[in-house]
UniProtKB/Swiss-Prot annotation:
UniProt KW keywords: Metal-binding, Zinc
Cofactor dependency: Zn(2+)
Similarity field: Belongs to the DNA gyrase inhibitor YacG family.
UniProt xrefs under Pfam families: YacG
An MF annotation (GO) of this entry: DNA topoisomerase type II (double strand cut, ATP-hydrolyzing) inhibitor activity
Region (Disordered): 48-67
Subunit structure of this chain's protein: Interacts with GyrB.
KW Metal-binding (keyword) present: yes
Keyword Zinc among UniProt keywords: yes
Name recorded for this polypeptide: DNA gyrase inhibitor YacG
Source species taxonomy: Bacteria, Pseudomonadati, Pseudomonadota, Gammaproteobacteria, Pseudomonadales
This protein's encoding gene: yacG
Length: 67
């Protein structure tokens, strides 16, 4: 049987075995998983978007919605 893949925990950098038995993957612990969740909730992490993508999304060319 081959060695399981080992990755770094995104929060603390500890080595983590990527196996089905590790319920916290890619994190090393529940604590690191919750720290990451808190960072997303506090908007410390963001998904990059091009500056004009929001303009296209909310374009005035769209018909007004019926209320």
């Amino acid at each position: 049987m081959s060695q399981p893949l080992t990755v770094e925990c995104p929060t603390c950098g500890a080595p983590v075995e990527w196996t089905a038995a590790n319920i916290n993957r890619p994190f090393c612990s529940d604590r690191c998983k919750l720290i990451d969740l808190g960072a997303w909730a506090a908007e410390e992490h963001k998904i990059p978007v091009s500056p004009d993508a929001e303009d296209e999304l909310f374009s005035e060319e769209l018909p007004p919605r019926a209320h």
